[in-house]
Structures are given as structure tokens and as C-alpha cells.
Design a protein with these regions (language model features):
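ATP-dependent carboxylate/phosphate-activation module, predominantly the ATP-grasp catalytic core
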Residues: 1-55, 91-118
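C-terminal structural cap/anchor segments
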Residues: 65-126
Length: 130
């Protein structure tokens, strides 16, 4: 989840769904908020996601920090169902999730994936998901 901390408080910016390989970031899904929520709803309750974003906005105290931040979460298997680990880490900076949100479509066009690769230098690419 991506947020912004301002003098007026914390504002939810959007959901960021990303891929990892061996624990390292590899890319984000570029889709509307609704499409990402539908995808997450296959695994965890959307009410739970809403509660997490509301609790972060209402109760997280970042002291004097003002700016973008990301809350990394993880969906894990547990006893035949999926569970949400609601706070793996908090990144007090603009994250790749913020970049993905700025590139995400406004309508339900074809899903895309933003990926970072490295072969002598970093390369950002966007491709169709299917």
C-alpha cells in the first residue's frame, strides 16, 4: 500500500501489487485500483485491506516525516487458506509502487507489468501481462 504523509495527516494513495524473485523486487502490476482489489480479493478479505489502510492513516505516527511512503505486506498460506501479513516493512521514501501508480491506467484496459531488469545496467520495461 502506498501513502503520503502531509501536515494534514496520512492519505492512502493506492494499492501496489508487486512481484519478487527470491525476495528481491522484480516488478509491479499496472492496473486500476478496482482491478488490483479484485485480484487481492481472491486471497484476502477486501474489508481487511480497507481496515489496514484506515488504521495506517489514523494511527501511524511518523513524527516529523512528510512525504511518500510504502507499507509492504505479504499474502501467505496458512492452514488451507491465505492470510495477510499486514506490515513486513515501512519504506519512508517514494517506492516503485508509487511509480507504478503513476503509470497505471485510468480504465480497465489490458493489464501490464512494469519490470526492472539488470544486465550491466538497470532497465525499466512495461509489457502486457497476458
Amino acid at each position: 500500500m502506498e501513502f503520503e504523509s502531509t501536515d494534514q495527516g496520512i492519505r492512502y494513495v493506492g494499492l501496489s501489487l508487486f512481484h519478487t524473485r527470491n525476495g528481491a523486487y522484480t516488478g509491479n502490476i499496472l492496473a486500476t485500483e478496482q482491478a488490483k482489489r479484485e485480484r487481492m480479493g481472491r486471497y484476502v478479505s477486501l474489508d481487511l485491506l480497507d481496515t489496514v489502510s484506515q488504521q495506517v492513516a489514523q494511527q501511524l505516527d511518523l513524527g516529523d516525516y512528510r512525504g511518500p511512503f510504502g507499507l509492504d505486506m505479504m499474502v501467505v498460506r496458512g492452514n488451507g487458506s491465505f492470510l495477510l501479513h499486514p506490515c513486513v516493512e515501512i519504506n519512508l521514501r517514494r517506492t516503485m509502487g508509487h511509480v507504478a501508480l503513476s503509470l497505471s491506467p485510468d480504465d480497465d484496459e489490458i493489464l501490464r507489468v512494469m519490470q526492472i531488469s539488470y544486465e550491466n545496467r538497470y532497465k525499466l520495461s512495461v509489457r502486457r501481462m497476458y
